[in-house]
């Protein structure tokens, strides 16, 4: 029993380090803003001009950009946006998704602002500041509420 108690801390540390190593994503690496595709840099400077790029992570097939105002933008390898997520209670700017989405929100949701938007195969998944999730097709036509 004494031998077991003697080796227990070492065993515990070994297991914890193994779990930590498995949890780390070796594919993500920090890169400079200059290494982003041109279309991603243009997107950030056009729609988020007042924020600075805080950190850029590169994976094999995508980029994740963290802005100084807390907004996170995911881009594919070509630099096209995939997901734009603002901090809680912060509204995203308009203009980078179909105008029909804004038209629907003005008419049916009292103009509620968008907190997160992502591109999906069917179109767009939108989370409003009110917490309501909506789905739109690729043209911006409302499909349904998302549970």
What are these regions (language model features)?
Residues 1-11:
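Bacterial N-terminal signal peptides that target proteins for export
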Residues 2, 31-147:
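First exposed extracellular module after export/assembly in secreted or surface-exposed proteins
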Residues 12-17:
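Sec-dependent N-terminal signal peptides of Gram-positive bacterial secreted proteins and lipoproteins
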Residues 18-23:
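C-terminal motif of bacterial Sec signal peptides marking the signal peptidase cleavage site
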Residues 25-28:
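Bacterial signal peptide processing site
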């Amino acid at each position: 029993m004494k031998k077991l108690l003697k080796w227990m801390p070492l065993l515990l540390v070994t297991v914890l380090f193994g779990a930590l190593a498995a949890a780390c994503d070796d594919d993500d690496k920090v890169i400079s803003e200059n290494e982003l595709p041109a279309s991603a840099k243009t997107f950030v400077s056009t729609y988020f001009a007042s924020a600075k790029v805080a950190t850029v992570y590169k994976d094999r097939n995508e980029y994740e950009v963290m802005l100084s105002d807390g907004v996170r933008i995911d881009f594919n390898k070509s630099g096209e946006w995939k997901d734009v997520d603002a901090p809680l209670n912060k509204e995203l700017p308009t203009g980078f998704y179909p105008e029909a989405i804004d038209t629907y929100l003005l008419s049916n949701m009292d103009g509620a602002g968008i907190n997160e938007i992502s591109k999906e195969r069917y179109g767009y998944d939108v989370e409003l500041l009110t917490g309501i999730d909506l789905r739109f097709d690729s043209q911006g036509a409302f499909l349904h509420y998302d549970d």
